Amino acid sequence: RGEIFGLLGPNGAGKSTSFKMMCGLAKPTGGTAKIMGIDILENPSKARSNLGYMAQKFSLYGNLTLRQNLEFFASVYGINFLNKDKRVDEIIDIFNFHDIQDMKSQDLPLGFKQRLSLACAVIHNPPILFLDEPTSGVDVIARREFWNHITSLAKLGVTILVTTHFMDEAEYCNRISL
């Protein structure tokens, strides 16, 4: 709990494919994967309820506002109606989205899109978080700020698995696999 595990390697090494298999989004040819003791192949829905996943490519809905994206993902992750608005407001506070919550996500700068993607992945308070090259294409300042959010989540006990090909990002990790 609370560790950041890095999967470091060049493009094409299979980092994203490995993540997709561990999250139940791609079927492995063999072996097993368990999330919180739940076999991802036998009970994918239950296993996925314990994890958040931020894809390398944005999974945001550009025609929805920042707030609407958060509300949508809260619904997808099963946050009930009574708690949804409260949780969305908490996320807006945590990520300091107050001034931009009514902007369409397609109009957000890249760094804010990255942060919104992370916010959507953690909206349901998962104990495990998969981040697939979360800072690719973002400027240095946005990368540092993004990693501040990641380390804050780890301090709260969230276990984080992150793929990267940046050596300086690997330094944030408690453990690394090549």
Predicted regions and their residues:
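Conserved ABC transporter NBD signature motif
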Residues: 31-42, 46-47
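Conserved ABC ATPase "signature" region
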Residues: 71, 75, 82-100
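Conserved ABC ATPase signature
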Residues: 104-111
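Hydrophobic anchor residue at the start of the ABC signature
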Residues: 118
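Catalytic Walker B motif of ABC-type/P-loop ATPase nucleotide-binding domains
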Residues: 129-132
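Helical segment within the ABC ATPase nucleotide-binding domain
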Residues: 144-156
